[in-house]
Amino acid sequence: MPGPIPKPLKARELETWLSQNADLTLVDVREKQELAIAPFPHPVKHLPLSEAQNWMGTLNQLLPPAGPVVVLCHAGIRSWNFGCWLLEQQPAREVWNLEGGIDAWSVTVDPAVPRY
């Protein structure tokens, strides 16, 4: 039986939430070199999946205890996987996945963010 999955979120919807100062936590699961190429233009918690062994045990301290979490990566696949895992760990949490990742953000919201 499949577990819980993150809710899909389009880049324009996230832009609206951010412009309204929504109380949410942005989690970027891309690698450091990806952030250097195309940084997200808002503060994020950087939790690269390749370093999960370094932060997994302290996840409860790294994320606020409540409130929505929006997860992003390059194309929305790694973030979706992380979102599924997070919902298994914290079933009561509201988790959203940025559909199309930073690439969709660049195409539909902010072309100043480089595509790679």
Tell me the role of every PLM-derived stretch.
Residues M1-T25, K32-P68, I77-Y116:
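Rhodanese-like catalytic fold shared by cysteine-dependent sulfurtransferases
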Residues L72:
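Short, surface-exposed ligand- or partner-binding patches at beta-edge/loop junctions that are enriched
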